[in-house]
Curated annotation (Swiss-Prot):
<keyword id="KW-0862">Zinc</keyword>
<dbReference type="InterPro" id="IPR055438">
    <property type="entry name" value="AstE_AspA_cat"/>
</dbReference>
<dbReference type="Pfam" id="PF24827">
    <property type="entry name" value="AstE_AspA_cat"/>
</dbReference>
<dbReference type="GO" id="GO:0006508">
    <property type="term" value="P:proteolysis"/>
</dbReference>
<feature type="binding site">
    <location>
        <position position="168"/>
    </location>
    <ligand>
        <name>Zn(2+)</name>
    </ligand>
</feature>
<keyword id="KW-0963">Cytoplasm</keyword>
<feature type="binding site">
    <location>
        <position position="60"/>
    </location>
    <ligand>
        <name>Zn(2+)</name>
    </ligand>
</feature>
<comment type="function">
    <text>Involved in muropeptide degradation. Catalyzes the hydrolysis of the gamma-D-glutamyl-diaminopimelic acid (gamma-D-Glu-Dap) amide bond in the murein tripeptide L-alanyl-gamma-D-glutamyl-meso-diaminopimelic acid, leading to the formation of L-Ala-gamma-D-Glu and Dap. Has weak activity with L-Ala-gamma-D-Glu-L-Lys, MurNAc-tripeptide and gamma-D-Glu-meso-Dap. Cannot hydrolyze murein tetrapeptide.</text>
</comment>
<keyword id="KW-0645">Protease</keyword>
<dbReference type="InterPro" id="IPR000834">
    <property type="entry name" value="Peptidase_M14"/>
</dbReference>
<dbReference type="GO" id="GO:0061473">
    <property type="term" value="F:murein tripeptide carboxypeptidase activity"/>
</dbReference>
<dbReference type="GO" id="GO:0008270">
    <property type="term" value="F:zinc ion binding"/>
</dbReference>
<protein>
    <recommendedName>
        <fullName>Murein peptide amidase A</fullName>
        <ecNumber>3.4.17.-</ecNumber>
    </recommendedName>
</protein>
<keyword id="KW-0378">Hydrolase</keyword>
<keyword id="KW-0482">Metalloprotease</keyword>
<feature type="active site" description="Proton donor/acceptor">
    <location>
        <position position="221"/>
    </location>
</feature>
<dbReference type="GO" id="GO:0004040">
    <property type="term" value="F:amidase activity"/>
</dbReference>
Length: 248
């Protein structure tokens, strides 16, 4: 049994028994292919709703806790309760290779065709304890998008979500300059503070691309956490998100 609050109403849902959670009850749909030819998959919402959103993880292949958390939530929730489209990973090649960037060494979260996109590459932090961000990766080509980026844009244009929640690690906050009700709800569910930005430049980011199109995008940064502990601590929050009906 899962209980949570949505728009100040208590919602109770009978979950799939744990013994039956190995398989997905919803068949994913392909929306493209990665650089190495892996299918890009999304799980379509099963509830007709004017507030259907997109829940996204796996932009960086080495950020796996939210992928596991979302997957377990999908397999725990009865299919007919899924209110939002879900992408467990938009970067499957990097998941397989254990890298942040895709198979072309492009950071997908710096490769969206935004006004502030730069061709000069970017850097990231090797680990949470590394004092500087100095590992070099590419930012792609604004005129010839990475297949993972191009496919996601096409899917959003097709499905027209009302909002996006994008999961990352390991900064431990909810990033939403608007401090929206949805961001506050997410902060409460995942026990994370809300911030205005990540405190460094992010040219070509997915969030910027969404903002330029007036598509609300909230980034949830989980703390440095294992997949196992994510499931233990945050499964209820992921399950609640998949059913949440935000007041947009």
């Amino acid at each position: 049994m899962n209980r949570y609050y949505s728009n100040n109403q208590e919602i109770t849902v009978s979950l799939i028994p744990r013994t039956e959670r190995a398989a997905f009850l919803i068949t994913p749909t392909s929306y493209g292919k990665s650089v190495l030819g892996a299918p890009l998959l999304y799980f379509p919402a099963q509830v007709e709703s004017n507030s259907r959103g997109l829940i996204l993880a796996g932009t960086h292949g080495d950020e796996t806790a939210s992928i596991a958390g979302l997957s377990c939530a999908l397999r725990s929730l009865p299919a007919e309760c899924l209110k939002h489209d879900v992408i467990l990973s938009m970067n499957p090649d990097a998941n397989q290779l254990g890298t942040r960037a895709n198979a072309n060494q492009v950071d997908l979260n710096r490769a969206f065709p935004t006004q502030n996109w730069t061709e000069h590459g970017t850097v990231y932090r090797w680990s949470s304890h590394t004092p500087v961000r100095d590992v070099k990766v590419k930012t792609g080509d604004k005129e010839q998008l990475e297949p993972e980026v191009d496919a996601l844009i096409s899917l959003i244009e097709l499905r027209r979500p009302k909002f996006v929640v994008s999961f990352h690690e390991p900064l431990a906050f909810v990033d939403d300059p608007a401090h929206s009700d949805l961001a506050k709800w997410l902060g409460k569910q995942f026990n994370l503070p809300i911030v205005d930005d990540v405190d460094y430049e992010t040219p070509g980011s997915f969030g910027t691309w969404c903002n330029e199109r007036q598509l609300p995008c909230i980034t949830v940064e989980l703390p440095p956490i294992s997949a196992d502990l994510t499931i233990e601590k945050h499964l209820d929050a992921f399950i609640a998100l998949l059913q949440h009906d935000p007041d947009l």
